[in-house]
């Protein structure tokens, strides 16, 4: 009898220890790989430019002074190559610095997470390809519309140098964008539909990736992407209304996969009533705060959405400090910082007064 009891106890203990070992392994596998990268990310976040620093930069007066004022920041490396101090050259240097941020994420993050940042970089490919094609069709210098980011940047630059639309097709051969571009030059779709199709493909790819993740990471990434889609669809709707487009025309430019039901908004005539309709949505709280200003300038909504996006990811990071949330929040803040610096470069280049620059850049998110 004792042997039987001992056997049962041993078996039970074996099962318990196996279960504990498995749970411990899962916890270590899930959280430990983020310990070093997230500690490094938090150190980098402490170096982001403060509002006081932006105010000091606004006093630069010249682009040479602006560049010199950033010598003690992370931008020093890319700005050190600036020689002509033109707006375009400095913008390229700032973009290069942002690209290095993404590259760093590839290096320090766990292998299972770094692919998401690679996918995020592909959005710059979509923007660049759409911008170059639109510029070519409008007979404008395409290189002026390129942002120096994205895995396909060499191909994008080659597209800008192409002499004919057919040359661009050869450059895009074998890429996901070849099919939509073929449809465009064949006359089956217009350039607006072409651009929409690029974004639909991109966000479908992002959502598929997010849904393939597990647990907290799946929750965060799925919500993050849905927020980005909602922002894009809402801005498309508002801009479409301002341009006098019909509900059918706006609907054809929307991206599937978001949480916001845009359909009721399509049948409202005025911007004011459209914004009021958003009160009952999950975005009502932050849109109410800027509604009056947004009725005069809808870009206010875009900036408010970007801030909301950062806030949501930062909140997730607070509850899940050893997750992809910390690096994602940092990249979003870095993108915002670069947008502000780019805006400041243009304003200084145009010779605007420091007080005007401070006011304008304070509104840029």
From Swiss-Prot:
Assigned keywords, A-Z = ATP synthesis, Cell membrane, Hydrogen ion transport, Ion transport, Membrane, Transport
In terms of superkingdom, the source organism counts as Archaea
Location in the cell reads:
Cell membrane
Q: Which GO terms describe its molecular function?
A: ATP binding; proton-transporting ATP synthase activity, rotational mechanism; proton-transporting ATPase activity, rotational mechanism
Has the keyword Magnesium been applied to this entry? Answer: no
Q: How does it sit in the membrane?
A: Peripheral membrane protein
Keyword Membrane among record annotations: yes
Gene3D superfamilies in UniProt: ATP synthase (C/AC39) subunit, domain 3, V-type ATP synthase subunit C domain
Record note on quaternary structure: Has multiple subunits with at least A(3), B(3), C, D, E, F, H, I and proteolipid K(x).
Q: What does this protein do?
A: Component of the A-type ATP synthase that produces ATP from ADP in the presence of a proton gradient across the membrane.
The name of this protein is: A-type ATP synthase subunit C
Organism per entry = Thermococcus kodakarensis (strain ATCC BAA-918 / JCM 12380 / KOD1)
